[in-house]
Amino acid sequence: MMSTKGITLFLCLLLLALATSVNGGQGTRRSRMTRALHGGRPSARYDAPYCSQEEVRECHDDCSGNPVRDACQCAYDPAGSPACDCYCVEPWRR
């Protein structure tokens, strides 16, 4: 039979695993409170919750002159970094 400490540890690890699997994906939308806690800026764009509209607009302007990679893809670090990472991609990869 497991001790009380063992059961508590097991439940904590189970909750941690569930929380990580729910919020760990890059495509998940985070709440305003979560973004505020991590220093992120809210945005209307689902694929770039940490990127401002100005950053996305600048990315589109930078990529518009590229003959192959003329679509802009903005992403964030799913580990919680508030950095906005924009780069040019082929339109079909968007």
UniProtKB/Swiss-Prot annotation:
- What are the residue ranges of the propeptide? 25-44
An example GO CC term for this entry is: extracellular region
Lineage, top-rank taxon, reads: Eukaryota
Keyword Cell inner membrane listed? The answer is no
UniProt's post-translational modification comment states: Contains 4 disulfide bonds.
Presence of the UniProt keyword Signal in the record: yes
What residue ranges are annotated as transmembrane? Answer: none
Please give the tissue specificity annotation from the record for this chain.
Expressed by the venom duct.
Cleaved signal peptide residues: 1-24
Annotated compartments: Secreted
Its keywords, alphabetically, are:
Disulfide bond, Ion channel impairing toxin, Neurotoxin, Secreted, Signal, Toxin
- MF GO annotations: ion channel regulator activity; toxin activity
Domain annotation text? The cysteine framework is XXII (C-C-C-C-C-C-C-C).
Reported function: Probable neurotoxin with unknown target. Possibly targets ion channels.
What name does the UniProt record give this protein?
A: Conotoxin Cal22a
Write down the species: Californiconus californicus (California cone)
